């Protein structure tokens, strides 16, 4: 953990530079690239891999057809420590969202449930609540649990692990040629945020980095809203309205934008200049991990149809700006923007201005540094 600030609010006078926070999050052990792990095995056997590990859902071609399987695994131990039901339901929501943003249709769920000693009432309650969250989310999305396993008695003299349901989701993409990828695609594309931030920094990577416990707990999950946003992104993909799609999860909106920039242009990187409206605190808008949010891009020609489609699904939607350049520049706008200047009647503050090259360096080397593998 870093030095604890007086508050989790990102206020310039408290010395919290959003760009530095973003680099710290990208390089943190929980958000950095997993390449040091997955490069140790061959994940491209039989040459069917369309999208490999490390950048959202994995995509495997089904030979002899136009179809592909799409798979994602997710877990949210930090939120599970606050609320086991929410931790499990969020994990299902994120895994299905990661499948949906490729354009694929989620088909089924598997799980690995990791808990402490169930003979202790507290641990048994955690297990019951997590299973309830898993069931509620699966019913909301109409998905069967095809199998799974349970690991109990995960304790040491220091105590039990936090409730950790690991969720896997598999889906089907009817035409692999329509695959939507997470990286920004081309200069001039319009960046659109679908969904909105809600209060709560508990369990977030930002709170962990700041070394401070969030008193307000994690943000809530509306399963109906989650189902609607996934239906929207699948329809947008089917109508060829998207040039990229990335979900907002660990690290919040700022990390989602940084990942899209880092992975942009086929991995070469592609920046953007954006303006984010602030309805809550800057910390919540940039680094809060409210679910049911997706960053999508479209050509300028298709952007109006994309925004209209989101509204037809009764989803909040806002155009943030456009793709281009070699820097990620994010301004905050609105009454909640701190350190802001007046511009045409609204408050505007520069929040993030970082080279894409620096974003990539933080993300690619963070896990190796954390594990002490830099010299390998």
Question: Where are each of the predicted segments found?
Answer:
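Glycine/proline-enriched, intrinsically flexible loops and inter-domain linkers
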Residues: 1-376
